[in-house]
Curated annotation (Swiss-Prot):
Main location: host cell
Protein name: Uncharacterized protein ORF21
Highest rank taxon of the organism: Viruses
Residue stretches spanning the membrane: 25-42
Membrane-topology descriptor: Single-pass membrane protein
Keywords linked to the UniProt accession: Host membrane, Membrane, Transmembrane, Transmembrane helix
Locations listed in the record: Host membrane
Lineage summary: Viruses, Varidnaviria, Bamfordvirae, Preplasmiviricota, Tectiliviricetes
GO terms under cellular component: host cell membrane; membrane
Length: 107
């Protein structure tokens, strides 16, 4: 899921560009940053606070990357979408579920 075309855990630049368009890299970035953060916190007991600072920087980058992917969105979609209430069409004939229920009631 998070591997690039080279098979490594870090995607290549072309993979990153394609994934941002599809919005897949945001989830991958967050998962990788949480993994790195957890590893750094685990090592913190044995080492120094530098690991935690690095993990925080990686996590901040992943959050910003996620927001950027959300704003850009997939291609062909406007950057800022207006959210209008959805007008559902009024059904002119009963649904399949209603028809099946009516048949069972008659039996």
């Amino acid at each position: 899921m998070c591997t690039g075309s080279t098979g490594s855990l870090i995607p290549s630049v072309s993979d990153s560009a394609n994934s941002v368009r599809r919005g897949n890299l945001s989830l991958c970035s967050v998962l990788l940053s949480w993994l790195i953060c957890a590893m750094c916190l685990w090592n913190d007991a044995r080492e120094s606070l530098v690991n935690v600072r690095i993990a925080n920087y990686v996590f901040d980058f992943a959050v910003l990357w996620t927001l950027l992917a959300r704003v850009l969105g997939p291609p062909g979609r406007p950057v800022l979408q207006q959210h209008h209430p959805v007008q559902l069409p009024v059904p002119t004939e009963p649904s399949v579920f209603v028809k099946l229920c009516n048949q069972r009631v008659r039996l």
